[in-house]
Amino acid sequence: MSYPTVSCKLIGIHGHAGSGKDTVADYIRFTRENTWKIPFARALKEACVRLFGMPLESFHELELKEAVHPYWNISPRQAAQFFGTEMVRETLPRLLPTIGSNFWIHRLAMTLNGLDESMPYDSDDVVVIPDVRFQNEYDWIIANGGIIIHLTRPGADGIVGIPSHASEAGILHTCPERTYPLSNQGSLDDLHAKVEDILTEANVYPFDNPDSF
């Protein structure tokens, strides 16, 4: 089963909940031109807002993600985990058999290729994806020439939301030459410095690196 292609550069961030994925993505986005942060789960979160009547910020702010909704008696994280995985990844292939479990990949590719009323992203653009959770998402980014930042942090063990959920199970780093480990256990400045080292080594922004010419 083939993956959709995109023209922009991709930076995927993989790590357990609470490891600092959004912090890293926001740092890259705000310190570089032509850089955008677009999660796989953007459309999922928007759908959950409509389905469950939960505010959008409850899917973005760490404390609110775990807060149990008084009506549904589940947290926003649990809602997104179940709807995104059990309902879409595992059930939607019955309707869309040609894409298998790759719906969220195709949905993001639609946006990046300008097929959902958005402007297309081209080779001058860098898109940071802060929520790489499944093997096919990792493989798709690698297949499109992107890199993966594997983020770890003490205490971020994936025990959140639905117990033992597949979205927190981890993935195999089958392309180590384009997978960059990053340990988030120091200060914010330390984290930023490590991100800069990765961006330089991976040559994501060649104009930042005179040695690349």
Predicted feature locations:
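ATP-dependent NMP and nucleoside kinases share a basic, alpha-helical "lid"
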Residues: W36, R107-G161
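Extreme N-terminal, non-catalytic leader segments
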Residues: M1-I11
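Conserved lysine of the Walker
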Residues: K21
